Each structure stands twice: as structure tokens, then as C-alpha cells.
Amino acid sequence: MKIVLITVDNEEITLKNIISAVLTQTAEAACDSLSIKFIDNIKAVEIEKVLAYKDDELIFNGYCDCQKSTVDEKGFQTYIYARSSACLLVDNDAFAYTYNCPSALSLFQAYAKDLGFKFKLPNVYTLKKYEVTSGASLFGAINSLVSMISGNGIRINASNEIIMLEVSKDILNLNSYPILSVKSIINRSEPISAVHYKKEFSSNYDCHTYSKSAKDLGFSRNRYVNLISLASWQRNYKISKMIKDSFKNYKCLEITINGYCSSELYQRFNYESLIGKFDDYLLLEKIYSYDKNGEKCKLVLGKNIDVKEVNYVD
């Protein structure tokens, strides 16, 4: 791993004595994170940006959040924690506004273009009204619209491109990777079996969405929500997301491999060993670690489940 620091005075420093570096990418988090420990003496310079490369490919492009330098009997050491460039969209509030027939492109132009991001989303739009409320972040304003229309969130890659986070069409086989360890986890404490809700003109929770998959698996976990204030297209998205999100930690694999995994988040995988057979698992988190002992990558995967939603009204 090659790491380049850029100071507030635009001076570039390529680290030569890295003790450890950990790059974390998570589908649920807007920002990737990179933590670094090194013994290069950078003195009192203030770091603004951090770049990380793997085999000359840019894998992290972000901003320094925290910088700590220590001198003791062991010598000089610095710790840096950085978040990817998506932090610019996360840390800034969007101005509140009600859009009529907005598209992802129109929100990008309003909220992200001037910050240097590039638009790489498909043609996502709605013919309805969309409200960006006070306190929403720039990231949240764009992500919510794209998610409600397409069912997929957005992601910012290392090239500052806003792309769609969607499930891969192909399925790779993890058995071809140099695997160090495998852990299988089944968590039955979270999946929701049904959502009961109120919509406009409802006085009771007389609208229902249940998961046929949850029923078949023996789950009985109900939620009651008041959705009177939401438009139908926003309401349907919220209910569907509640059920789907509840299954994310149901069946998981944690696999540590030797070296680096270049696969993107939401890549689908199959895996089979003495621990069991695992078909169609999504890559939800990737933790790449580098130190004097070499490099390894921890992959956290979740079962790709069709929750089979069924709707009915009393």
C-alpha cells in the first residue's frame, strides 16, 4: 500500500515507514475510513488530504479528520484518521426545498457539482414532488431520492464519482481466494415478519405488508407505524426498506483472506467448505489491513434474500 499525505500548504508527503493502515468500506456508511500509524517525522505540518494506492490504483481519496503525533522513549509516531471525500456531502446540510418532478441529475447540480463530484448515476427521476427537509445532508438529499425511486442507494468512489450501489449481476466464487479463516453467523433476533401502518384517511392500522419469506422461516415480529404524512411512493419505499433491512444481519459470513480483495461492495459470492454451502451472499463490508506482517482483507457478507412482500388491506 502506498499512502500520500497532502498538507494544507499543498505539499505532498509519501510515507515510507508505515506501522499499520486499515481501510474500511461499508455499504451502510456513506464514507470509507482510513486509519494510519507511521514513524515518518512530518514535524508540525498539518495534513488536509490523504490518498491511498494499491498497485498504482487509487483506492482511497479523503480528508484528514484527526492527526495525533507522539514523541517518547520509543521515538516519533503519528496517527491519522481520514474519511473519504463523501464526507463533504455528509458534513454539509442541504438547503430545504420542495422539488417538483426532480431527477438525480437536478439534485446533483444543486448540491454536489460545485464540490467537484462527477455524476455517474442512471437517469433517475420522479414526476411527483420531493421535499428536502431542514437538517438533511447533501448526501442524504440525493441518496433518499435515488433510493425511493430505484431501491438502490448511492456511493462515492475514489475518483469522486457518484455511482449507484447496486447488487452485481454476476456471482464470484470465494473458494478461489487465499482464505485464512471463515466464520458463519445466524442471527434470528432482527427479521421483521410484518409491518402494519396507517395511511391517509386511516384511523386504524388497517394496511399491512408481510414477508412470505419471514413466515416460511418461522419469524413472528410485527411493527406498527403511522405513515399518514407520506406520499404513497415514499410510504411503499419506507415499508419495503424496513423489512429488507431487518434481514441484513440474518445470515452472515466473515471471511478473512490473504492479500487484497478488489471486488466492490454488493458483489455477489458463493462459498463452500466444511462449515457449509453458502450461495448468493452480498459483500457488505471490506476491511483491508496492512502492517509489517503483510496484508489481509476481512470480508463481511450477508445472504441475498428475496423477502417476498405481500400487501393487503382490512
What do these predicted ranges mean?
Residues 51-80, 155-156, 270-300:
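Short beta-strand and beta-hairpin "edge-sheet" elements
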Residues 75-89, 121-192:
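Short beta-strand-centered interaction patches in the first periplasmic/extracellular domains
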Residues 5-10, 52-55, 199-202, 271-275:
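Short acidic, glycine-rich loop/turn motifs
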Residues 15-44, 182-314:
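An acidic/polar, Gly/Ser/Thr-rich interaction patch typically located in mid-to-C-terminal regions
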Residues 38-118:
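Surface-exposed cap/loop segments at beta↔alpha junctions
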Residues 1-17:
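Polar/acidic, low-complexity leader/linker segments enriched in S/T/G and N/D
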Residues 101-115, 135-148, 198:
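Polar, S/T/G-rich
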Residues 90-96, 174-177, 310-314:
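Short, charged, solvent-exposed linker or helix-capping segments at domain edges/interfaces
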